[in-house]
Amino acid sequence: MFAVIRTGGKQYKVANGDVIKVEKLVADAGATVTLDDVLMVSDAGKTTIGTPVVQGAAVTAEVVAQSRGPKIIIFKKKRRQNYRRKNGHRQDLTVLRITGIQA
């Protein structure tokens, strides 16, 4: 059984036991979160596609950790003007372990 969920503006295909990194969710490590934005559920060949979400479907997950992504370097330059700007960014992420899919 798997589902397609939407969180943080992105879509993820998940199954029981999967570990995924999503955009930061406000929850402590060890907490349980419920993701209600389920776009599709498939179970033993029976597929349900939502319009836009599947009614009554939910995915439960356990928060494993709050982490940060890799550092992205932003470098701006204008030639011949001695204009250089260097900036860095690390995105806050939440690591989730999928514990259940209810269709």
UniProtKB/Swiss-Prot annotation:
Keywords from the named record: Ribonucleoprotein, Ribosomal protein, RNA-binding, rRNA-binding
Q: Which domain of life is it from?
A: Bacteria
Does the record bear rRNA-binding in its keywords? yes
- List this protein's GO terms for biological process: translation
Query: One GO CC term of this entry?
Result: ribosome
Specify whether rRNA-binding is a keyword of the entry.
yes
The cross-references to HAMAP family, in alphabetical order and at most eight, read: Ribosomal_bL21
Similarity comment text for this entry = Belongs to the bacterial ribosomal protein bL21 family.
Relate the assembly described in the record. Answer: Part of the 50S ribosomal subunit. Contacts protein L20.
Q: What function is annotated for this protein?
A: This protein binds to 23S rRNA in the presence of protein L20.
Q: Which NCBIfam families match?
A: L21
What is the protein name given in its UniProt record? Large ribosomal subunit protein bL21
Q: Which organism is it from?
A: Rhodospirillum centenum (strain ATCC 51521 / SW)
Encoding gene per record: rplU
